[in-house]
Amino acid sequence: MTQEEKIERFHEIVNEMANLYAKKNANYGDSFSKLYNDLGPMAGLVPLHNKLDRLTNLIKGNHNDFESVEDTIRDLACYSVMFLIELENSSNDKGENN
């Protein structure tokens, strides 16, 4: 795969993740933001920690029928972006610049 093809694929993956994020928020509400607002920045670490544990188990060969390495990596990426958005919102609410 060329560098140009990798960049194109990167954009495709990010767009797929954004669409899934929008659909889940439409169906379930913005539970991550609610949790973050209730518990603060430490709440953002919980789903990342859980997904890293799952990824570790999957890579070690503890597979199951409904989770994949690829899906777990996408989940980690989505939660990371969601965490970043909440951090930015918190900083903006406090008048801070990051």
Label each PLM-derived region with a short phrase.
Residues M1-N98:
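Intrinsically disordered, low-complexity regulatory regions
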